[in-house]
Amino acid sequence: MAKPANAPKTGKTMLKVNDPIELEVVYNALTGISDAMAVAVVHTSRSSIVRLGYDFSTGILSPKGELVGQGLCQPIHMGGMPPALRAFTKYYEGRIHPGDILINNDPYEGGSHLPDIFLFKPVFAGETLISYVCAMSHHTDMGGRVPGSNACASTEIYQEGLRIPPLKL
């Protein structure tokens, strides 16, 4: 798919750091930002799953979807962030702009299962896309045929609840 003429520029994929001290400083800065995001999620959430169970995750990804920062959360969620972001870049290539919020829980488009909802926000420096930040949270019920949305006898995904394809909010 060709990029529109007004598409934002995309920053380089990897930061080249040769000095181990500089690498550690960058690593800790990215981890610190991800941790601060996690603290903000806990302090603003009304969900007991988030506030008490910590069943959520935060992270920072490169414009190409590489995980570069991970917050204090569930490490198992980190594997879902890159494919969920790649689903957005597939559908919205060249059409992601400052202020966009992207949502997805579709297991066929990078999500893990319907109760895990991913939110991504692109981060720009001027007109250049430099990263995405992600907050992902487990939800107790997605409106499936049984409370909790996880019915073992389901024969199709639509019986499990609301399936959200990669969308802009």
Model-derived regions: residue spans:
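Conserved mixed alpha/beta core segments that line enzyme active sites in large multi-domain catalysts
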Residues: 39-47, 66-68, 73, 81-122
